[in-house]
Amino acid sequence: MNEKYPIGEFQFDGEITNIIINEWINEIEDLPRLLKNTVIDLNNEQLDTSYRSGGWTVRQVIHHLADSHMNAYIRLKLAITEENPVIKPYDEKEWAELYDYNLPIEISLSLIEALHKRWCSLLRDLSPTDMERTFKHPESGSISIGKNIGIYAWHGKHHLAHITSLCKRKDW
């Protein structure tokens, strides 16, 4: 198994249908529960273990998910309310070194739970036309809301797999 990409990299070149969108939204909606159930019994030593050599710790992954998904939510709102807005990327590696990534995971778990409720509520209210709206990432180009939903459904599963595969390898 590839420890960096335990579920593979995001790939989707097909037609983004309502069925696929709903599956992706369900995956985003399920992440807070799955994440909490996976990490709730881990101790500080386990939380401060890297999921792979040179990778983030479990604690950093959890805080990263909160930061990344907050950015996704804001990008969604920008794409809904503006015409192909240019979004500001951030340096996730630098953010992972900031002090708040040392805080208890419960803070980010609560944030992720609340954020995903709002995010999924908004996503479920979008029309098929809304799904085609885009934002422009300076490095990746224009991305539709529909595709971005898929990216973030994958993103949550990707990082959850980092944690679950570590737990399995360590027999936690």
UniProtKB/Swiss-Prot annotation:
Homodimer. Possible metal-dependent hydrolase. It comes from Oceanobacillus iheyensis (strain DSM 14371 / CIP 107618 / JCM 11309 / KCTC 3954 / HTE831). This is Putative metal-dependent hydrolase OB0782. Belongs to the metal hydrolase YfiT family. GO terms for molecular function: hydrolase activity; zinc ion binding. Zn(2+) binds at residues 64, 155, 159. It is found in: Cytoplasm. Its EC number is 3.-.-.-. Keywords: Cytoplasm, Hydrolase, Metal-binding, Zinc. One of its GO terms (cellular component) is cytoplasm. HAMAP family: YfiT_hydrol. It comes from the Bacteria. Binds 1 zinc ion per subunit. Its cofactor is Zn(2+). It is an enzyme of class 3 (hydrolase). InterPro entries: DinB-like, DinB/YfiT-like, Put_metal_dep_hydrolase_YfiT.
